[in-house]
A protein has these predicted regions:
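Small/polar (Gly/Ser/Thr/Ala-rich) solvent-exposed segments
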Residues: 84, 107-124, 137-163, 283, ...
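Bacterial N-terminal signal peptides
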Residues: 12-21
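Amphipathic alpha-helical coiled-coil segments
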Residues: 85-100, 164, 168-188, 193, ...
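Acidic, low-complexity, intrinsically disordered peripheral segments
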Residues: 2-4, 27-46, 61, 428, ...
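Periplasmic alpha-helical coiled-coil/stalk elements that build and connect Gram-negative outer-membrane
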Residues: 2-3, 35-38, 159, 164-278, ...
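Amphipathic alpha-helical coiled-coil scaffold segments and their short linker/junction regions
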Residues: 71-79, 217, 221, 251-320, ...
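Regulatory alphaC helix of protein kinase catalytic domains
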Residues: 47-75
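Membrane-embedded beta-strands of outer-membrane beta-barrel proteins
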Residues: 131-133, 337
Length: 477
């Protein structure tokens, strides 16, 4: 009778116990860390004092059915697929952390081995079931650095969500401001048609009475047609921006817009003092640097040995497995201490080290570029705001003198007959041109306020997005 090894039941029991104990581990990492769903600059690095978030109750609400700027931004952020895409990428990177952490746990594998072997006094074919466990004991930081790199990649994905939110908020604000701009310009253009039409009516009346020439009527009617063409141009731009806003809001058509100046902007360029440390692009560069540093350390650790413990069990399926050695047991168990050292990998380890070093340099440059772009954008917006503010003051002061000249020309044309119709038409057109410029300048200032908030990292605060859940993630200061 064949002698049975007393170690076989022992090892089988040990493997059974390990399988039972490790079963929760196999199922524990089936989701990302819940903390990854809370995103904010202050959570990603040692940030300066965060700008206080607007309370949810402070969110601008619609005036009746009218849509405010902050409400439009929030509506877009709650549904837009670009944010959903960024959140999905975060979940992917979160699972990457679980993959990296799996290196800390035992790796159990099993399978069927078949082949040709020699020894035991002869050569033979053999088939065997194999069950093995491998537990890393020490690897000079390979797994630690892999986890650090995965965590940095997740942080970068978080910063990307903030960047997508900021870009979407800026685009929605632009569309809201432009739609409102052309609403106002269309209203002024309609007033212009009525004003020039009244002058054309007077010119026709005077022509019928013989008090003026037919050329006055032709000139006046030409100005009326020009005013109508202006209205059609503004109508075309209005439809364009209204369609853009509707797409950002996920609607067929947006509701009417609030008429009040958005309090969320509050002359942001005149008080902008944000820190570039809150900018998503800077946070992404910092996360890329941390990831590159971890990958560089991991690549260097690859050149060092890995110490692991490896128990395994083989169960032969051949009927003549012990043909050449009758003392050979069908089930064999062993435990081994492995020291694995890479000898030659075709230069892969060196290449990975160089690649990580280049990525580290690129991350430093990306941070510098992000800060430079933000400073430049902020400086340009503030400089333009200063110039447009002075122009706005001049336009407002000019309105009174233009109105006075229009009234004077009207009396001289109608009562005294000393002023030609062309002067009256020019004065009328100058009034409305000034109103067009006033409305356009005010809208330009609103756009520049959005730029200042964007380039100072304060856009989410201004629109009340902080402290809110957007498509599964919590936005924090």
């Amino acid at each position: 009778m064949k002698r049975r090894s007393p170690l076989s039941p022992l090892w089988l029991g040990a493997f059974g116990l390990l399988a039972l104990n490790l079963n929760p581990v196999a199922q524990a990492a089936d989701d990302i860390d819940p903390r990854l769903r809370t995103i904010g600059p202050s959570l990603m690095r040692d940030a300066p004092d965060a700008i206080p978030a607007r309370p949810p109750s402070g969110q601008a609400t619609s005036n009746g059915d009218r849509l405010g700027l902050a409400e439009a931004v929030l509506t877009a952020a709650q549904w837009h697929p670009s944010i959903a895409e960024a959140v999905g990428n975060l979940y992917k990177q979160g699972e990457g952390i679980n993959v990296a952490r799996a290196g800390y746990y035992p790796q159990i594998s099993g399978g069927l081995r078949t082949g040709y072997d020699t020894g035991y006094g002869g050569d033979r074919n053999s088939q065997a079931l194999n069950l093995s466990l491998k537990q890393m004991l020490y690897d000079f930081g390979k797994v630690d650095n892999a986890v650090s790199a995965a965590q940095a990649a997740a942080t970068r994905a978080q910063a990307n969500i903030l960047l997508v939110v900021d870009d979407l908020a800026r685009d929605t604000a632009y569309a809201w401001i432009e739609t409102r701009r052309y609403e106002q310009l269309m209203a002024i253009a309609r007033d212009q048609i009525r004003g020039v039409g009244d002058i054309a009516g007077m010119a026709r009346q005077r022509s019928d009475m013989g008090a003026s020439t037919r050329s006055d009527v032709v000139q006046a009617e030409s100005r009326v047609e020009g005013a109508r063409a202006t209205l059609e141009e503004y109508q075309s731009q209005y439809e364009r921006w209204r369609s853009t806003l509707a797409e950002l809001l996920g609607r067929v058509a947006p509701p009417a817009l609030a008429e009040e100046t958005p309090p969320e902007l509050n002359q942001a360029c005149k008080r902008s003092s944000g820190s570039s440390d809150r900018l998503p692009a800077v946070l992404m560069a910092l996360a890329l640097r941390a990831q590159s540093q971890a990958e560089l350390a991991q690549a260097k650790a690859e050149a060092y040995p890995t110490l692991s413990l490896q128990p395994q069990v083989n169960h032969y399926l051949d009927n003549d497995y012990n043909r050449d050695n009758r003392s050979l047991d069908r089930t064999q168990a062993g435990i081994y201490l492995n020291v694995e050292v890479p000898i030659y990998q075709g230069g892969a380890i060196s290449a990975r080290s160089r690649a990580a070093g280049h990525a580290l340099s690129a991350a430093d440059s990306a941070e510098d570029a992000a800060r430079l772009q933000a400073r430049r954008g902020l400086a340009e917006a503030m400089a333009q705001t200063s110039g447009l503010s002075r122009r706005l003051t001049s336009l407002e002061a000019r309105q009174a003198s233009i109105q006075e000249a229009r009234q004077l020309y009207g009396r001289q044309y109608l009562d005294l007959g000393t002023r030609p119709l062309l002067d009256l038409l020019n004065a009328e057109q100058e009034i409305y041109q000034s109103r067009f410029e006033l409305a356009g300048t005010r809208s330009d200032l609103l756009r520049l306020d959005v730029d200042c908030l964007y380039n100072s990292g304060a856009l989410r605060t201004a629109f009340g997005l902080e402290g809110r859940n957007l498509q599964g993630v919590e936005i924090e200061p």
